[in-house]
Amino acid sequence: MDVAVVREPFNLEQYDRIFLNHEPWVIICNKEHFLAKRPEGVRVSELQDASLIIPIRQPIQNEINSWFNEIASERNIFCLYNSITSVMGFAEHNLGVIICPESAKNLINRETLTYRKIIDPVHESGTYLVKKHLQLMATATEKFWKYVEHQTKSNPSKYKESMR
């Protein structure tokens, strides 16, 4: 693989990287779920009573667990997912609440599911385009890398990486 798009947290030390964007973490749940009744968003403390469906990647699990550790709260992990579409049925049948990046809202069945931002505290996740340090790339891949690099440098306000 020449380049990849990865979501933080990720060990970025061994990679050249281009920051792409930040997006908030949200929950996806059945419209009848008690958390769906919170139009302003949900607090991490409100998630302690929900059956949670979280990503399988260990660094992301550690980050989500740290949210609960910060408030000394328990959590109920119902299942782990690698592909969010594979667990949408659990949320549709009101078996659990999916924690995911906001962009996943574009995949939901809006007749049965809704999403709410996690607001207290707010948590965000960044995405990066990465390649290994000093990696030789195919000409087309190298041109793509330089194009993305140019786009992010020519519009720094859109691609501003925050300190986490």
Please tell me what each predicted stretch does.
Residues 50-72, 137-145, 155-161:
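Secondary-structure junction motif
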Residues 7, 54, 73-83:
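Short beta-strand-to-loop elements that line the ligand-binding cleft
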Residues 47, 89-95, 129:
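Hydrophobic residues within well-ordered alpha-helices
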Residues 1-6, 82, 99-101, 105:
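Short beta-strand and adjacent tight-turn residues that come in two discontinuous sequence segments
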Residues 1-29, 38, 66-67, 92-95, ...:
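Short beta-strand-centered segments that line the small-molecule binding cleft or hinge
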Residues 8-10, 25, 30-40, 50-61, ...:
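Short coil/turn segments
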Residues 114-158:
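A late-sequence structural motif
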Residues 13-16, 43, 85-87:
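Short acidic active-site motifs
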